Amino acid sequence: MIINFPTKDHWRSASRLDYVIKGLDWFADNYNKLNIESVAFPPLGCGNGGLEWTTVGPITYRKLKDLPIEVEIYAPFSATRKEISVDFLENSVIKTSNVKGYKLGSYNKYWNLLLYSIQQLNNDRYSLHVGRTIYQKICYILTAVGIPTGFVFSKSEYGPFSPEAKNALLILANNNLINEETKGKMIEINVSESFVLDKNAFSSDDFEKVNKALDLFYRFKNTESAEIIASILFASSELKNSGSVNADKLMHYLQEWKPRWNNDECRNLLMEYSIELASMKWLSLSN
């Protein structure tokens, strides 16, 4: 038996949390009349509906956990381990009034170059494989070299961050183009085996930019080095908008942005990376 849960007014609209709650309440009141002995629930209203699992998950769990039937609740691929734990689902504080999902955007064909880059890195045994932190760095650098991803970046604790890039993960997942797999302590983002890049859809200039970015990605030793590289490039770009960039300005910007880097050891490390990036023509430092 399949039970339809309307979560929105129109298929193109964002989902409404109150519809999800009404549907769950209806199910709790009527499952016995339908002779249901076991049931599986998807993450209602998440995905294209735009509701957050951090709200939907706890509500679904609390509405269904005491029913005397077998219940399975599936989380979206983007949910973290913490967000699927019993402690989180039982105890997190949630807002339930006037909650409406955000509308996921449309698919950007240049994200195929992002998928291609992730695919290349994950298929290279010597490269750092792609998790959520590295994903943001890849998105930033591809955008920085001129790939029109549509992502806008700003400063965050671990380097440049884009809400649009995070949103793109949901769109890619909804199109069955990526999935996540737990490998040790890391959650790896994998490109679906069915994905094959149509190289005829892109120019030689596009591939030149992607290959330049890939050459840099292959140099990521760990998430820390990826953070340093992306942060230096972001800082250089921001400073360049207001004039020339020299080492002192760059160090001041980075250490003001991230106080944990405000020590001699980190400054020396940042300088090493900056000089190497300058030698690779990724940035230009004036005297």
Question: What is each PLM-predicted segment?
Answer:
Residues N4, E72, L233:
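Residues in well-ordered beta-strands of folded domains
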Residues D9-K100, L104:
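Phosphate/ribose-phosphate-bearing ligand recognition and processing surfaces
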Residues M1-W11:
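Short, basic/glycine-rich phosphate-binding loops at helix/coil junctions
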Residues F77-N287:
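Domain-edge interaction signal
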